[in-house]
From Swiss-Prot:
GO cellular component terms given for this protein: extracellular region
Signal peptide: 1-19
Tissue: Expressed by the venom duct.
Keywords: Amidation, Cleavage on pair of basic residues, Neurotoxin, Secreted, Signal, Toxin
Source species of the chain: Conus ventricosus (Mediterranean cone)
Family as reported in the entry's similarity comment: Belongs to the conotoxin T superfamily.
Top-rank lineage group of the source organism: Eukaryota
Propeptide regions on this chain: 20-43
TM region positions: none
Protein name listed in UniProt: Conotoxin VnMLCL-041
GO molecular function annotation: toxin activity
Residue positions where Lysine amide is found in the record: K64
Subcellular compartments: Secreted
Amino acid sequence: MLCLPVFIILLLLASPAAPNPLQTRIQSNLIRAGPEDANIKTDKRVIISGLLASILVPLIDAIKG
């Protein structure tokens, strides 16, 4: 009779430890995929305008006082 509770406890402990096959497959695909595969392209104009905005806005605020 002691085997049944021990079996149930072991079953409960082992089930969360098993990986989700879909999740591991998606993770492995994401690891192998590069930015060019995901159509992620950084636009230089966006980067430059962001840098200029972060520099110019405090400068203009300081000049206005």
